């Protein structure tokens, strides 16, 4: 059945499973560098024309490492799908499909050594008849899936890093320093956590009224102010500086007014800044560099004149020194101002800015003194506040000590009152306990006295009763001496009566058991056909329910015997005669007899003579004769033993008769055991 189901299911498999396309040889990692137009793929599918090979020349580039490997592998057996250089063909549902018929076969050439180097590129053989197929593109779904997995893994790793940064300080430092946007992400999560834990704090912060700061007047620093990378302007030609034309005159005429405006503007800016921020004077004072005049070009005839110095020698401006003020802001301001002085001193027109620079120095000196005074005032006010704070602290400490002393005194009074009340309670409870113990001791003593009195009364009553009994016994012995003997006789009679009743019950059960056994025997002997005796045997088992011997005897009987019945003696004898005739026919058969042996034995059994009397030999005829004699005598046990000694076909033919005889003997033996047990019960009672 199993083979049939498997065989029937085999034709269904090709219809439900996708047809397997033949494997293809793909290019190795070195062959992938070859141009796409010259790339070729070789199929393993073999057809009737598989013996045809592509013509190759010994000097062509077809004897590369790729074709050597292909030839060596195809000469033994086609490689399986597990090979590293073999890729399964595209499924029919893929974007591009390539039929095996259009793919040229693998050239099976013997491996050639020494023709190609390991690093040389592989070029397939040129075939004029075959056109290169379009290259196969790998499935894009795997790339998208890998990219998606990469993004998911990176996102999970980034989220795990942010989460672990909130737990570990060392990892927090590493994550915020080396991971892009790590610090922003961690700070955002911490801020969200803080807002979730303290929502009211953020509301209060948002509700605060922002007071605008007084930052003073807005200071604008010109683009040309500050230090310059030029040490000095390049000198123009002397002729241009000495000649004063219309442009030069205008430039020199505007220079003093421009210098005055620049100085006044710087002074106003310094004043506004010092008034706006008294303690913070760290801003740079904008000083516009001097405008250098643009010299006009003279005519070509003046170029040949000798050069003369255009500007007198530059006098250096003294630098500002502030040694009394140690404020970093003032020192930075002085440094910036000195840098400005250095730049102006390096210029040719430094003498023009001497006046504004001097005024600026005075203003800066005044500002430094003002800052020192403000700092001193602030220190004095701070010292005053510290002294006031110390005084307030001392006062509050004294007040706190006074309160602590008052609380301590009050607590001591309360503790004393509680102690007194607790002491009174303990004394009261102890007194009550002592009184209770005394009362219990008195009660115990009184109860002991009562018990002694009761014992004495009981003892007196016992003595009185013993005296009365003695007197009564003496009187009874005199008048009622025969009453005790009569009572003893009655008790003995009752005992004998109870014993005889048990004997009667046992005898009754034994008789009932004997009757049940006789009923079973009668049923077996008087039946002409096998008759079941289940009811009779059940009655025997119920009457001897407590007897293990009877139960074992009944259990030894085969269930088929009392359910179907057993044949009688006459039936066994009649059946033996039929079995004996069949056994005589097969008495001459060997164990492995054929049809000829059966026919010969049947013929010879007709001419054999039957034995009479008590033969002593062990042949089949002698055994049958002895068995018939035992059956006529009624000795079924010996008859069964004789028939059991048969061998071969004779024993096989008498097997059923032996089984019936065994069942009959088992039933008879069980009935004999039950009858014997019943007799033993009667003997035990006697």
Swiss-Prot record:
Region span, Disordered: 66-140, 287-307
Keywords: Coiled coil, Membrane, Mitochondrion, Mitochondrion inner membrane, Transit peptide, Transmembrane, Transmembrane helix
Cellular compartment(s): Mitochondrion inner membrane
Transmembrane annotation, as ranges: 147-166
Membrane topology, Mitochondrial intermembrane segments: 167-686
Presence of keyword Transmembrane helix: yes
Mitochondrial matrix side: 43-146
GO cellular component labels: MICOS complex
Pfam families: Mitofilin
A biological process from GO: cristae formation
Stretches assigned to coiled coil: 357-495
Biased amino acid composition, Polar residues: 66-77
Membrane topology, record value: Single-pass membrane protein
Domain of life: Eukaryota
The protein's assembly and partners: Component of the mitochondrial contact site and cristae organizing system (MICOS) complex.
Role according to the record: Component of the MICOS complex, a large protein complex of the mitochondrial inner membrane that plays crucial roles in the maintenance of crista junctions, inner membrane architecture, and formation of contact sites to the outer membrane. Plays a role in keeping cristae membranes connected to the inner boundary membrane. Also promotes protein import via the mitochondrial intermembrane space assembly (MIA) pathway.
Family: Belongs to the MICOS complex subunit Mic60 family.
Protein name as catalogued: MICOS complex subunit MIC60
Organism name: Ajellomyces capsulatus (strain H143)
């Amino acid at each position: 059945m199993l083979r049939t189901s498997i065989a029937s299911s085999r034709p269904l498999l090709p219809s439900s499973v996708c047809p397997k396309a033949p494997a293809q040889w793909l290019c190795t990692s070195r062959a992938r560098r070859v141009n796409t137009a010259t790339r070729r793929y070789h199929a393993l599918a073999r057809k009737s024309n598989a013996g045809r090979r592509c013509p190759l020349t010994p000097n062509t580039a077809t004897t590369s490492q790729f074709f050597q490997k292909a030839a060596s592998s195809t000469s033994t057996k086609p490689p399986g799908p597990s090979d590293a250089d073999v890729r399964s063909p595209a499924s029919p549902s893929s974007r591009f499909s390539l039929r095996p018929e259009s793919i040229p076969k693998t050239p099976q050439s013997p491996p050639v050594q020494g023709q190609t180097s390991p690093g040389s590129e592989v070029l397939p053989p040129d075939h004029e008849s075959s056109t290169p197929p379009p290259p196969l593109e790998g499935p894009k779904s795997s790339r998208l899936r890998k990219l998606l997995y990469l993004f998911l893994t990176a996102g999970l790793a980034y989220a795990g890093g942010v989460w672990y940064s909130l737990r570990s300080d060392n990892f927090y430092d590493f994550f915020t320093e080396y991971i892009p946007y790590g610090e922003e992400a961690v700070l955002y999560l911490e801020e969200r956590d803080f807002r979730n834990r303290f929502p009211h704090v953020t509301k209060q912060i948002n509700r605060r009224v922002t007071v605008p700061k007084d930052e003073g007047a807005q200071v604008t620093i010109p683009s040309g102010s500050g230090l310059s990378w030029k040490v000095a302007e390049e000198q123009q030609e002397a002729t241009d500086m000495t000649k004063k034309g219309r442009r030069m005159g205008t430039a020199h005429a505007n220079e003093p007014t421009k210098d005055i405006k620049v100085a006044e503007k710087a002074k106003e800016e310094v004043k506004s800044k010092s008034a706006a921020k008294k303690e913070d004077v760290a801003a740079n004072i904008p000083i516009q560099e001097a405008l250098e005049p643009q010299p006009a070009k003279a005519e070509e005839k003046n170029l040949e004149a000798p050069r003369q110095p255009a500007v007198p020698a530059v006098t250096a401006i003294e630098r500002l020194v502030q040694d009394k003020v140690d404020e970093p802001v003032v020192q930075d301001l002085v440094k910036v101002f000195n840098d400005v002085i250095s730049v102006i001193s390096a210029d040719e027109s430094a003498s023009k800015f001497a006046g504004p620079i001097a005024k600026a120095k005075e203003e800066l000196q005044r500002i430094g003194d003002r800052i020192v005074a403000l700092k001193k005032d602030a220190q004095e006010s701070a010292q005053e506040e510290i002294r006031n704070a110390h005084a307030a602290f001392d006062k509050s400490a004294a007040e706190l000590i006074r309160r602590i002393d008052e609380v301590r005194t009050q607590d001591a009074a309360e503790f004393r009152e509680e102690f007194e009340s607790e002491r009174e309670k303990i004394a009261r409870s102890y007194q009550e306990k002592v009184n209770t113990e005394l009362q219990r001791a008195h009660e115990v003593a009184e109860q002991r006295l009562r018990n002694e009195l009761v014992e004495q009364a009981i003892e007196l009553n016992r003595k009185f009763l013993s005296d009365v009994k003695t007197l009564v016994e003496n009187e009874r012995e005199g008048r009622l001496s025969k009453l005790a003997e009569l009572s003893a006789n009655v008790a003995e009679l009752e005992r004998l009566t109870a014993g005889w009743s048990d004997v009667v019950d046992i005898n009754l059960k034994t008789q009932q058991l004997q009757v049940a056994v006789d009923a079973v025997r009668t049923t077996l002997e008087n039946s002409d056909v096998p008759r079941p005796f289940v009811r009779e045997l059940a009655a025997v088992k119920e009457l001897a329910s407590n007897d293990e011997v009877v139960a074992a005897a009944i259990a030894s009987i085969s269930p088929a015997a009392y359910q179907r019945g057993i044949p009688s003696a006459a039936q066994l004898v009649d059946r033996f005669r039929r079995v004996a005739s069949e056994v005589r026919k097969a008495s001459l058969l060997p164990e492995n007899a054929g049809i000829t042996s059966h026919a010969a034995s049947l013929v010879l059994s007709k001419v054999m003579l039957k034995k009479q009397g008590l033969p002593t030999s062990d042949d089949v005829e002698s055994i049958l004769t002895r068995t018939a004699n035992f059956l006529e005598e009624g000795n079924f046990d010996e008859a069964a033993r004789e028939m059991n000694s048969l061998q071969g076909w004779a024993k096989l033919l008498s097997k059923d008769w032996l089984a019936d005889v065994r069942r009959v003997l088992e039933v008879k033996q069980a009935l004999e055991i039950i009858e014997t047990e019943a007799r033993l019960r009667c003997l035990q009672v006697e």
